[in-house]
From Swiss-Prot:
It comes from Saccharomyces cerevisiae (strain ATCC 204508 / S288c). Residues 195-257 form the t-SNARE coiled-coil homology domain. The lineage of its organism: Eukaryota, Fungi, Dikarya, Ascomycota, Saccharomycotina. This is Syntaxin PEP12. Coiled coil: none annotated. It is a single-pass type IV membrane protein. Its main location: membrane. Pfam families: SNARE (PF05739), Syntaxin_2 (PF14523). Belongs to the syntaxin family. Signal peptide: none annotated. CDD domains: SNARE_Qa (cd15840). It is found in: Membrane.
Length: 288
């Protein structure tokens, strides 16, 4: 049996390599997903830095600083931007998943599965940092509310004290006049500003939590794609291993056959030599 015959049939694909495939659509989508994923990961990294900075302000007890509100606004904008990118990349992933397996080679199928898994990982990371950010902002709001309540109590106490002093100063009081005591205009303005910020943050936190719930539906779709692609790649790898095992077994059998053929040929030579010697011996006897 020749080597070509032995390694024919089912193992032909192994020696000829993966089937040729040219899918411009897959290549375009792969590049789009990779670019979108790069942008998402960069934005997530920035959001993580913003969240860490906000935590440091909480640790210092300085939640009323103007920079806290600036970071909060930028963080909320980042979350909205990343959410839009997630939805966009999910659309690209669905298009890429819709490409028929028959039009892709094994390398492309594995590359597709890796991209889908990377997108899934980034999505989970985004969900995690969203939850961290909302927890941090809840702490900021709690501290801000406590500070605002303390300021309000201090102002009320100061007003009461002022009223008592004016009531006790009868010598300087004009009969029939009405005492009107107002909070300092600057303090009133700051109080209203801080109160408005707290309300805005509460609304933003609610919006983010609602966004997390909405994106969970996207993640379910993505998780289904990941599972399908994972099964497909596992089957490909199993086929590769099976083919490799079959090839190794065939190679072993071929080596055994070749060794047997060599031994057989060697014995044939020995037998031929013995026959020649015997014929020569008979010939010499007959000559005598």
């Amino acid at each position: 049996m020749s080597e070509d015959e032995f390694f024919g049939g089912d193992n032909e694909a192994v020696w000829n390599g993966s089937r040729f495939s040219d899918s411009p659509e897959f290549q375009t989508l792969k590049e789009e997903v990779a670019a979108e994923l790069f942008e998402i990961n960069g934005q997530i990294s920035t959001l993580q830095q913003f969240t860490a900075t906000l935590k440091s302000f909480i640790d210092r007890g300085d939640v009323s600083a103007k920079v806290v509100e600036r970071i909060n606004k930028r963080s909320v904008a980042k979350i909205e931007e990343i959410g839009g990118l997630i939805k966009k990349v999910n659309t690209s992933v669905k298009k890429m998943d819709a490409i028929e397996e028959a039009s892709l080679d094994k390398t492309q199928i594995i590359a597709r599965e890796k991209l889908v898994r990377d997108v899934s990982y980034s999505f989970q990371e985004f969900q995690g940092i969203q939850r961290q950010f909302t927890q941090v902002m809840k702490q900021v709001n709690e501290r801000a509310k406590e500070s605002l309540e303390a300021s309000e109590m201090a102002n009320d106490a100061a007003l009461l004290d002022e009223e008592q002093r004016q009531n006790s100063s009868k010598s300087t009081r004009i009969p029939g006049s009405q005492i009107v005591i107002e909070r300092d205009p600057i303090n009133n303005e700051e109080f209203a500003y801080q109160q408005n910020l707290i309300e805005q943050r509460d609304q933003e936190i609610s919006n983010i939590e609602r966004g997390i719930t909405e994106l969970n539906e996207v993640f379910k779709d993505l998780g289904s794609v990941v599972q399908q692609q994972g099964v497909l790649v596992d089957n490909i790898e199993a086929n590769i291993y099976t083919t490799s095992d079959n090839t190794q077994l065939a190679s072993d059998e071929l080596r055994k056959a070749m060794r047997y053929q060599k031994r057989t040929s060697r014995w044939r030579v020995y037998l031929l030599i013995v026959l020649l010697v015997m014929l020569l011996f008979i010939f010499l006897i007959m000559k005598l």
